[in-house]
């Protein structure tokens, strides 16, 4: 499996690639949660545009922020990714319902979130190998 050294550990290049990918995901999601938690005009208007009332903007931002915090902490990163998958699935469903042409964007963010963990966490590679170790 690419990124695994001969002794079975994750290579330094794989770890750094995973950190960079995860870092980009975290930066985007922190920005998104901040505009919602602070109830900035862009966050409120965007939420109203997709059919949600203005009073749910801050709670949505807090939920997203909690998911991101769990994703950033190495011990809880997989739980954070699972919760982010649910959050991003809801965003995708909302965007599909509104016929938004960018409906795949949350899917891409979710894929990158999982790819970042997969590249840097040997536990996830063991749990979900991309290929069988049997010949």
PLM ranges: what are they?
Residues 14-18, 38-41, 61-63, 84:
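Short hydrophobic/aromatic-rich motifs at helix boundaries and adjacent loops
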Residues 27, 31, 52-72:
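Core segments of alpha-helical transmembrane spans in multipass integral membrane proteins
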Residues 1-31, 75-135:
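Extended, low-polarity transmembrane helix blocks
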Residues 1-9, 50-60:
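Hydrophobic alpha-helical transmembrane segments
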Residues 38, 52, 91-94:
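Charged, amphipathic alpha-helical interaction segments
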